Regions:
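Conserved beta-strand in the GNAT
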Residues: 79-81, 87-97, 108, 113
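Conserved GNAT-fold acetyl-CoA-binding loop/helix
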Residues: 45-69
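Short loop/turn motifs at secondary-structure junctions and domain boundaries
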Residues: 70-75
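Short, often N-terminal, low-complexity regions
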Residues: 2, 19-26
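A short beta-loop-alpha structural element at the N-terminal edge
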Residues: 27-43
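C-terminal "cap" of GNAT-fold acetyltransferases
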Residues: 42, 141, 145-151, 163-183
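Conserved acetyl-CoA-binding loop-helix of GNAT-fold acetyltransferases
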Residues: 111-114, 120-133
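Conserved active-site tyrosine of GNAT-family acetyltransferases
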Residues: 154, 159
Length: 183
């Protein structure tokens, strides 16, 4: 038998869920990499730390050189950053022919990355949505991406798996999203 609380007291209740910290609900700013190139070094090191087991990400200097190409302003690749004030949160890019073995697939969403401390805030979703808006603005008919493990996330937004294949030492799903027409 459990004892009733003394008169004037209420039984202990589960604590109410605390609201998200203010920084978790502030708008996420997406800017072209060209507007904040000072983040290239931080981004290159973060990508290397996360993906260094895979060939494109094994060398910080090559990563920096890739992002320097995104600054040229002559078509793709184009990259965007998610920032909070002066702090880098993540990145995404539009590029051509991301998997050389698949030359028939021209336009790709790639390099979608959120720094560990910014995960769970919707940063990746905002980056992808922004990249899709830019792809539509550019008139791209369709986009492809590859992922080893988050197919379900992209499927919720209309991406369809078209094949699985080995790439950079892992099995990935190649996915497609039609943007214009019936490509």
């Amino acid at each position: 038998m459990t004892a009733s609380p003394p008169n004037g007291f209420q039984a202990a209740r589960k604590p109410k869920k605390q609201p998200a910290p203010l920084e978790a609900i502030l708008p996420i700013n997406i800017v072209p990499l060209a507007e904040q190139p000072q983040h290239i070094d931080t981004l290159a090191h973060a990508l290397h730390a996360e993906w260094h087991d895979f060939a494109p990400w094994q060398n910080v200097e090559k990563i920096r050189a890739y992002y320097a190409r995104c600054l040229e302003g002559h078509g793709l690749p184009l990259a965007w950053l998610a920032v909070d004030g002066g702090r880098l949160l993540g990145s995404a890019a539009l590029k051509r022919h991301d998997i050389a073995a698949l030359p028939q697939y021209e336009y790709w969403l790639g390099d979608v990355f959120v720094l560990p401390e910014a995960r769970g805030r919707g940063v990746g979703r905002h980056l992808v949505e922004h990249a899709l808006l830019e792809a539509r603005r550019l008139g791209l008919p369709e986009l492809y991406l590859y992922t080893p493990d988050v197919q379900a996330v992209y499927a919720k937004y209309g991406w369809r798996e078209i094949e699985t294949r080995p790439h950079n030492g892992e099995t990935v799903s190649v996915m497609r999203l039609v943007l214009h027409g019936s490509a």
